[in-house]
Amino acid sequence: MLNPDGAEVFTRRNTLGIDINRDALDLASPEGRTLKSVRDSLEADFGFNLHDQSKYYNAERTDKPATLSYLAPAYNYEKDINEVRGNAMKVIVLMNELVQGFAPGQVGRYNDDFEPRAFGDNIQKWGTSTILIESGGFLNDAEKQEIRKLNYVSILAALYSIATKSYEKIDLAAYEKIPQNDRKLFDLKIEDVQYELLGNTYTLDIGVHYLEVDNASHSEYFTKAQIMDLGDLSTYYGYETMRAKGYKIIPGKIYTPKKGEQPTKEKAYSLLKKGYVYWLGPLAMGDNGFNFPMQVVSNKFVLPDFRLYVGLNPSFLLSKDGVISHAVVNGYLIDLQKESSAFRNAIFLR
């Protein structure tokens, strides 16, 4: 691991404040100097460059997440292909073929624009065939456990092809057939929903991301949803998509509990069906938020006039034919008829 200090607190930069992966030329960081020294001492024929990647990347023009993205980095601006880079491309073709059996359509080809300061690009230039593996998203795998397995079988396939030299028979053109990755995924996409503003009704799409917020020790997190885009999102996709034609957005109300009334999941579903989205009163919020499907508000909280905008933490109701059938609480879609959801947590609003 190149940056253990950054990994401890989920940040790209090291304790010095440097992005080590932009330090291949200056070698100002001790980590960068160590990596360069190891590469030069080994003069390895092949190298694997493992990265974490946002889960919002997809295989281009598909709704499939780019669970893994591969790249044989360019070593110059012209993106020339010499034997060193070509060998990396050939191995990637075999890796992709194997992974397709476990995650069909969920492999992308990372952008190969040359970055002269990056280690991957320079290690390729220094003579080691470099294979970048970016680990993106996989449905219902927030901790990337399934993606770890795909990394394992992917690297195993690569090592076998190197040991047997089977990669040498691969046609380079097959590398270009791997779809490029794109960044057009939302956690939740609501399509064609009706939204009333200033007396007029509009039909639009809503795209939501679940942003992770760490606790003080970085040992746990809660999610805070945010609207990332509004309007025509027909070229975007969602891990979860609701086709909401005929549904109307209904602003939620605040519920004031009776003395001694306890917040339960059953109570929350009942209140949501009646138009309440917010629970007034003190609740103990854990490190991973409130495991209670209503937003929790303080006595000082004033419910603003309802309006959608990019950056909003979305909480509202959805009705069809006058019946409230769904709720969106902290960006999580809840089917009130089935009382089912992938709900993770609500948040406290002051």
Regions flagged by a language model, labelled:
Residues 1-105, 124:
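Active-site/substrate-binding loop(s) of hydrolase catalytic cores
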